[in-house]
């Protein structure tokens, strides 16, 4: 009996094992078959897999190399190397569907957007019931553990277009249970295009929609911005990366209901024409946030700093660099912003910033330090007959203890002005009303010659000497201005007229003679009052001063005498000016050269050293213009290089770079819409090698001309050093002449005579020179 019972048990186990085994063996391929047979019927999409393993006794499912295709397409919508899940069968008895574990191995999903439609819209429509069932189901659902390893998410937008993805996506969550409101987990991923990583943890209450998260971002590439920028800009490039360490709590249903703290930094920011030319850049923009809550109207920062910012604004003949990029008055941006059928990340960021900025000033705010360090703000004007360039560098701005509850907040700005000068501004402002502030500013040591591009274009007269200072005090209450502004131009000297077509002519020497006060100084105070909307410039005070200056010179003050003496001493250093592109010595300079020659002949042991100081940028610009105009002239006259003579050279030299026919010639030859300036067009036409050759030839010709003015007997006492390329304070290339020891009186006197210092009223000198 025992043997029979034992035998029955063994046979039963064998049968059970065979039944289970056969069930598993047959149900797995059957599952694969049924899925692939009815996939399109129930999902509208083709689903494939290498193999399936299903255990109906344990509730374990495993699909290998699962692939779900796009609707009526061979392209993949979703794939996963392995999909595994465990269903608790016993819980089904209690009307509970519980997935104890769900694992996705290297899943790849693709989201495609076309206007307002997505590539998963059909799935939502297929599985969404026609009528919402409001009856309470008796079934409960839980998923206890979710794990995603090595995933990828791709996002494609067809209109702009956008192509972006993240990789190495890892998510691990304790899941959600039917009787627990919260879901928690951790996540991490890498940038698919570029560098950088993101990791963090989250906790969401599914009932109240409250959330909290900790987020750490390291050097995450923001190049997706460049793809959205292409819809806004006619051209351009963008790159930057993000660092962040943020802790936040909030509510999903209200975007304003968020409170966060931590650090946010945008690094290595570059935006510009191309990869080599930036319009805006910075090394780091960093915010240290102590407490930020739009809903509570609270903005507290430990610091906000912008480090090494760079900004370049350029004016062209009919537009500027920003309008050339974004359309006239930002037309491209407005068009995209007004199109509600499109999503543009840049527009949405701008809208969010605008809302937060409005909320910021309506809230309590405190910033312990707001700073800009080592900035470089550049302005180029190519709309003139020659390029004007200036910049604030290094630009520094600091404001400490900015607090809305304080009566006054102070800030200071200090900057160098290049090519010459410096600026300082101090401001005391009411944080509750920006229409209340006091300001003092001072701009000093600015070279008058640096404005020669404007003077030549609008008067035809450059200056080769002079210094500008501007300072003032503003007291503003409730938007009403009371200010005194003081303009001082020290010892300006007008040089020879530049005769060019398309250049206005104004008798600048005569005007200077009217407006200069005693001591060769222009000194005026210009009060400004009124409001910001309707400021009043008290020009009548200047006019009365001008009229008085014509008939009665002000008394000679100690200050102006000191200024004159300082300027007089400055000019006692020996220099020999070279007007732009000139190689011959002027008759007025010949006397000075003869004095040097006589001194060297009388003192054989003496020697002088010449240090050429070349204004390379300006000389090369003039050479470039000449060579480009020469090409145009020769094409127009059908001439060759051999037949180009001095008369032709004079005609080319007198031709304006603003000549309409010349500009049409450049446009027709080059056919490049990305060349915005006359300098760029001429450079592409001529080539840099020809300009460099012309500049070297110019330097050699000047050296030969200078040496040929001396007798052979003294040439051994003259040494000409290698040149130095600079931006000269007085606006022209020059030779610096050094003599070992104190400068001999005879040379100093000859030099002073060369300068023709004007001790008499300059107006009288100008009038005497007229017929």
Where would I find each of the regions flagged by the language model?
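Terminal hydrophobic membrane-targeting helix
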Residues: 19-115, 132, 137, 143, ...
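Amphipathic hydrophobic-ligand
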Residues: 42-46, 72-87, 160-172, 190-200, ...
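Secondary-structure transition motifs
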Residues: 65-173, 206, 273-288, 294-394, ...
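Extended terminal
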Residues: 2-13, 292-297, 302, 361-365, ...
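Transmembrane beta-strands of outer-membrane beta-barrel pores
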Residues: 106, 152, 219, 266-268, ...
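Solvent-exposed beta-strand/coil patches in large extracellular/periplasmic or lumenal scaffold regions
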Residues: 125-159, 181-192, 251, 255, ...
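Buried hydrophobic packing residues in well-ordered domains
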Residues: 39, 63, 83, 102, ...
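Transmembrane beta-strands of outer-membrane beta-barrel proteins
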Residues: 214-216, 261-265, 305, 440-442, ...
């Amino acid at each position: 009996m025992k043997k029979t019972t034992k035998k029955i048990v063994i046979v039963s186990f064998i049968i059970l094992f065979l039944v289970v085994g056969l069930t598993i063996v047959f149900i797995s391929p059957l599952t694969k078959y049924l899925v692939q047979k009815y996939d399109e019927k129930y999902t509208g999409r083709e689903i494939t897999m290498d193999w399936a393993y299903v255990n109906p006794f344990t509730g374990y499912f495993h699909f290998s190399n699962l692939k779900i295709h796009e609707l009526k397409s061979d392209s993949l919508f979703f794939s996963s190397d392995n999909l595994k899940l465990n269903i608790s069968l016993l819980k089904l008895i209690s009307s509970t569907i519980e997935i104890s574990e769900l694992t996705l191995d290297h899943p790849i999903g693709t989201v495609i957007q076309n206007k307002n439609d997505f590539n998963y819209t059909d799935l939502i429509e297929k599985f969404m019931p026609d009528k919402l069932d409001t009856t309470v189901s008796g079934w409960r659902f839980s998923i206890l553990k979710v794990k995603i390893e090595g995933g990828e998410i791709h996002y494609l937008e067809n209109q702009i277009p956008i192509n972006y993805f993240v990789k190495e996506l890892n998510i691990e969550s304790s899941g959600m249970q039917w009787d627990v409101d919260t879901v928690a987990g951790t996540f991490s991923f890498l940038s698919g295009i570029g560098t950088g990583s993101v990791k963090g943890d989250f906790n969401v209450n599914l009932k109240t929609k409250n959330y909290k998260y900790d987020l750490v971002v390291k050097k995450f590439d923001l190049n997706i911005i460049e793809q959205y920028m292409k819809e806004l800009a006619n051209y351009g490039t963008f790159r930057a990366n993000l660092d962040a360490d943020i802790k936040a709590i909030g509510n999903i249903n209200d975007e304003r209901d968020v409170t966060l703290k931590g650090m946010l930094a945008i690094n290595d920011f570059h935006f510009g024409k191309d990869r080599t030319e930036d319009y805006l850049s910075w090394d780091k923009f960093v915010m240290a946030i102590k407490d930020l809550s739009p809903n509570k109207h609270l903005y507290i920062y430990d610091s906000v700093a912008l480090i090494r910012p760079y900004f370049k604004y350029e004016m062209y003949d009919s537009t500027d660099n920003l309008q050339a990029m974004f359309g006239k008055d930002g037309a491209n941006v407005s068009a995209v912003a007004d199109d509600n059928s499109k999503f543009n990340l840049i527009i949405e960021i701008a809208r969010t910033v605008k809302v937060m900025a409005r909320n910021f000033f309506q809230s309590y705010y405190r910033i312990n330090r707001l700073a800009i360090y080592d900035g470089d703000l550049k302005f180029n004007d190519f709309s003139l007959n020659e390029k004007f360039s200036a910049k604030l560098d290094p630009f520094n701005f600091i404001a400490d203890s900015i607090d809305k509850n304080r009566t006054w907040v102070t800030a200071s700005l200090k900057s160098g002005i290049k090519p010459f000068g410096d600026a300082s501004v101090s401001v005391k402002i009411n944080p509750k009303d920006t229409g209340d502030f006091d300001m003092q500013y001072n701009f000093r040591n600015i070279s008058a010659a640096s404005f020669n591009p404007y003077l030549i274009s609008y008067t035809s007269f450059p200056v080769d000497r002079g210094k500008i200072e501007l300072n003032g005090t503003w007291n503003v209450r409730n938007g009403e201005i009371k200010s005194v502004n003081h303009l001082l131009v020290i010892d300006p000297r007008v040089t020879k007229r530049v005769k060019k077509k398309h250049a206005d002519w104004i008798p600048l020497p005569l005007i200077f003679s009217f407006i200069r006060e005693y001591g060769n100084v222009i000194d005026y105070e210009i009060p400004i009052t009124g409001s910001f909307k309707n400021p009043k410039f008290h020009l009548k005070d200047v006019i009365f001063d001008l009229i008085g200056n014509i008939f009665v010179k002000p008394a000679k003050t100690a200050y102006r005498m000191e200024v004159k003496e300082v300027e007089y001493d400055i000019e006692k250093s020996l220099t020999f000016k070279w007007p732009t592109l000139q190689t011959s010595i002027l008759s007025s300079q010949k006397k000075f050269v003869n004095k040097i020659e006589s001194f060297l002949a009388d003192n054989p042991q003496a020697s002088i050293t010449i240090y050429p100081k070349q204004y390379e940028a300006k000389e090369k610009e003039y050479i470039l213009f000449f060579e480009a105009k020469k090409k145009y002239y020769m094409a127009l006259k059908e001439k060759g290089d051999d037949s180009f003579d001095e008369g032709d050279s004079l005609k080319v030299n007198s031709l304006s770079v603003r000549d309409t026919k010349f500009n049409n010639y450049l446009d027709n030859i080059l056919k490049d819409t990305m060349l915005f300036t006359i300098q760029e067009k001429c450079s592409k036409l001529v080539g840099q090698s020809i300009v460099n050759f012309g500049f070297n030839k110019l330097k050699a010709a000047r050296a030969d001309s200078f040496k040929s003015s001396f007798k052979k007997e003294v040439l051994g006492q003259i040494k000409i050093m290698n040149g130095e390329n600079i931006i000269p304070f007085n606006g022209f290339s020059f030779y610096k002449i050094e003599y070992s020891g104190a400068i001999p009186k005879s040379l100093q006197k000859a030099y002073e005579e060369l300068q023709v210092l004007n001790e008499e009223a300059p107006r009288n000198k100008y009038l005497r020179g007229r017929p």
